[in-house]
Amino acid sequence: VSHLHEDKKILNRVRRLKGQIHAVEAALTQPEPSCIDILQQVAAIKGAVNGLMSELIEEHLREHVIQDPEAVNEQDLQEFLKLLKRYG
């Protein structure tokens, strides 16, 4: 996992999630929060979490599972990751 502390893209995703969650919390403290607005915000959070999961899985595969990066068919790997994002 040591490679993750240097990954700015993943850290930025986490920071955006933090901001989105903070926005939901703030909306819930309003006198009459809009259920639709909150549901839209939560749906965005869900999408962001799924994106983060996909990115972490790809990093894990590339750093810890694939033993020989030269032996990997990059097109097949990308197809697998695409399926994982869609159905995972």
Task: Identify what each model region corresponds to.
Residues 1-88:
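Solvent-exposed interaction patches of small proteins and small membrane subunits
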